[in-house]
């Protein structure tokens, strides 16, 4: 792989999607080949899995089922979209990757980070990001943002109680500590314009 694989992580309402849309024009005007994608999703098979994972009525979904579905969506997305783009020297900006599974299923769902990491090592064949930006935000702030966003569809994970969302953040902070060589923590509780500027600087300092 010749390209650069940058993943954007964070709890619900941290601004990942908006951030990526703000990063795209900057790198495009610099004539950098850049592509944005998301997990779960990005391609037809993985988008179908996303629909299953996000259905509000599927509250009975068991934690291992959830973890395996995310890993399956990740595998197909990786081989069908991400790896080919990296081979063509793209900068790939991905909304979520393996660290989401570690924080959500490994820590918040209680499956254990090591177990979930091994599932995802198998799914990704140890393909890891060049750089990960973790957008840190208090769960209450993130969920309040979601509540104000009339255009955002509320999914099954959004509906979890505040205790779950606090555990997700705790999990992420452990992931940041565990993979400090590739993860940079950025405060997401700031104006989006400033957040975009800060993340651009991090990407350029670390990779370009």
From Swiss-Prot:
Uppermost EC category: transferase
One annotated Gene Ontology cellular component of this protein: cytosol
Residues bound to ATP: 10-17
Catalytic reaction(s) noted: dTMP + ATP = dTDP + ADP
InterPro entries: P-loop_NTPase, Thymidylate_kin-like_dom, Thymidylate_kin_CS, Thymidylate_kinase
MF terms in GO: ATP binding; dTMP kinase activity
Keyword ATP-binding found: yes
Keywords on record: ATP-binding, Kinase, Nucleotide biosynthesis, Nucleotide-binding, Transferase
EC number(s) reported in the record: 2.7.4.9
Pfam families to which the protein is assigned, alphabetical: Thymidylate_kin
Disulfide-linked positions: none
Protein family per UniProt: Belongs to the thymidylate kinase family.
Name this polypeptide is given: Thymidylate kinase
Source organism: Bacillus cereus (strain ATCC 10987 / NRS 248)
Underlying gene: tmk
